[in-house]
């Protein structure tokens, strides 16, 4: 799952890096207007959506049902064990606090 996250992060940074490399002559020292901010927000939103779609598509392609089933099985077994040991710990704690009466 870490590699998927890194790949998605790489795609986002690549898309943003390509957007940042603009023509130096087109840069101006004017304050940002509301229309420019709206355009930048829309551009960022579209790039984010495309990166998200690419990451989702990559996840769909690399999805392994056997691994997912193993993870679900390990989760259910570990939660059952934790529940059992938490109950034992709670009983021991109550018996220590209550003492012998």
Swiss-Prot record:
GO cellular component, one term: chylomicron
Region of interest called Lipoprotein lipase cofactor, as start-end residue ranges on this chain: 78-101
Post-translational modifications reported in the UniProt record: Proapolipoprotein C-II is synthesized as a sialic acid containing glycoprotein which is subsequently desialylated prior to its proteolytic processing.
Positions in coiled-coil regions: none
One GO BP: lipid transport
Region (Lipid binding): 66-74
GO terms of molecular function: phospholipase activator activity; phospholipase binding
Chief location category: secreted
Keywords: Chylomicron, Glycoprotein, HDL, LDL, Lipid degradation, Lipid metabolism, Lipid transport, Secreted, Sialic acid, Signal, Transport, VLDL
Leader sequence segment: 1-22
InterPro entries associated with the record: Apo-CII, ApoC-II_dom_sf
Cited Gene3D superfamilies: Apolipoprotein C-II (1.10.1440.10)
Record has Glycoprotein as a keyword: yes
Record's subcellular location: Secreted
Function in brief: Component of chylomicrons, very low-density lipoproteins (VLDL), low-density lipoproteins (LDL), and high-density lipoproteins (HDL) in plasma. Plays an important role in lipoprotein metabolism as an activator of lipoprotein lipase. Both proapolipoprotein C-II and apolipoprotein C-II can activate lipoprotein lipase.
Record-stated family: Belongs to the apolipoprotein C2 family.
Protein name stated in the entry: Apolipoprotein C-II
The species this protein was found in: Tupaia glis
Gene behind this protein: APOC2
């Amino acid at each position: 799952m870490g590699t998927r996250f890194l790949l998605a992060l790489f795609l986002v940074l690549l898309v943003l890096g390509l957007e940042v490399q603009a023509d130096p002559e087109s840069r101006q020292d004017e304050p940002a207007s509301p229309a420019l901010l709206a355009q930048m927000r829309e551009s960022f939103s579209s790039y984010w959506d495309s990166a998200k779609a690419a990451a989702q598509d990559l996840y769909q392609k690399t999805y392994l049902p056997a691994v997912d089933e193993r993870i679900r099985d390990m989760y259910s077994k570990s939660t059952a064990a934790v529940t059992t040991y938490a109950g034992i710990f709670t009983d021991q704690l109550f018996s220590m606090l209550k003492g012998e009466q």
